[in-house]
Amino acid sequence: MATTTCQVVGLLLSLLGLAGCIAATGMDMWSTQDLYDNPVTSVFQYEGLWRSCVQQSSGFTECRPYFTILGLPAMLQAVRALMIVGIVLGVIGILVSIFALKCIRIGSMDDSAKAKMTLTSGIMFIISGVCAIIGVSVFANMLVTNFWMSTANMYSGMGGMVQTVQTRYTFGAALFVGWIAGGLTLIGGVMMCIACRGLTPDDRNFKAVSYHASGQNVAYKPGGFKASTGFGSNARNKKIYDGGARTEDDEQSHPTKYDYV
């Protein structure tokens, strides 16, 4: 029961984390314009992994996709790759973990096969969560670097006496969604790996005394003592008295009470 519960909880957490990773990858608010010390408030800009958007004070929003691949920063392309790899591994892990549930029987599949499938799905979930967390963290580090570079350029004119207008970007909502989703997927993978231990058959060896069914030539030897039933090989050379098998001379030398009539 505990193994099934651990599997189901791990699957649900991983499924929720995978949905969060997909949502974060498709969101446009990976970076949002910092409005602090910005005199222009009628225009709000934000960017995602696939396009950049401009929102006006009237409520009209215009988005423009990135029409180039080679012209994009290498960090942005790396983040894209990490998020896509995390999503693909998460989808495969979900499919494997569904068939690995202990409460689902498929043909003659035993617990050892389900244990291997559970461990495989758990490892996939862990890698998927790590990819999502690394991708979001790399993008966040890029934002922090650009933010402080833009801040330094704002106060560089005329010895810092003249402030120039610079567009600075800060963390968007997609970063927090990606961090939470990656953490949930990672926790789900750990729980699936823990559930694998409950499905693994116990192969430990225990010391025991071998027992054989009793027979004519069976001898039990505990600690050097030998006991025999009397019907073994040692008893074959012994002469056994048989009152029913006598010769004629034996009958004459050993009369019975019926001989005196």
Swiss-Prot record:
Phosphoserine: residues carrying this PTM: S214
Topology, Cytoplasmic side: 1-6, 102-122, 195-261
Domain of life: Eukaryota
Cited InterPro entries: Claudin, Claudin18, Claudin_CS, PMP22/EMP/MP20/Claudin
Key words of the record: Cell junction, Cell membrane, Membrane, Phosphoprotein, Tight junction, Transmembrane, Transmembrane helix
GO MF annotation, one: structural molecule activity
Intervals, Extracellular compartment: 28-80, 144-173
GO cellular component, one term: bicellular tight junction
Location (main, coarse): other
Subcellular location: Cell junction, Tight junction; Cell membrane
PANTHER family listed in its UniProt record: CLAUDIN
Membership in a protein family: Belongs to the claudin family.
Job of this protein: Involved in alveolar fluid homeostasis via regulation of alveolar epithelial tight junction composition and therefore ion transport and solute permeability, potentially via downstream regulation of the actin cytoskeleton organization and beta-2-adrenergic signaling. Required for lung alveolarization and maintenance of the paracellular alveolar epithelial barrier. Acts to maintain epithelial progenitor cell proliferation and organ size, via regulation of YAP1 localization away from the nucleus and thereby restriction of YAP1 target gene transcription.
Any single GO BP term: lung alveolus development
Ranges annotated as spanning the membrane: 7-27, 81-101, 123-143, 174-194
Quaternary organization: Interacts with TJP2/ZO-2. Interacts with TJP1/ZO-1. Interacts with YAP1 (phosphorylated); the interaction sequesters YAP1 away from the nucleus and thereby restricts transcription of YAP1 target genes. Interacts with CLDN19.
Required for role in regulation of RANKL-induced osteoclast differentiation as annotated region, ranges: 195-261
Region of interest: Disordered: 242-261
Name assigned to this protein: Claudin-18
Tissue expression remark: Expressed in the lung (at protein level).
Membrane topology summary: Multi-pass membrane protein
Any matching Pfam family: PMP22_Claudin
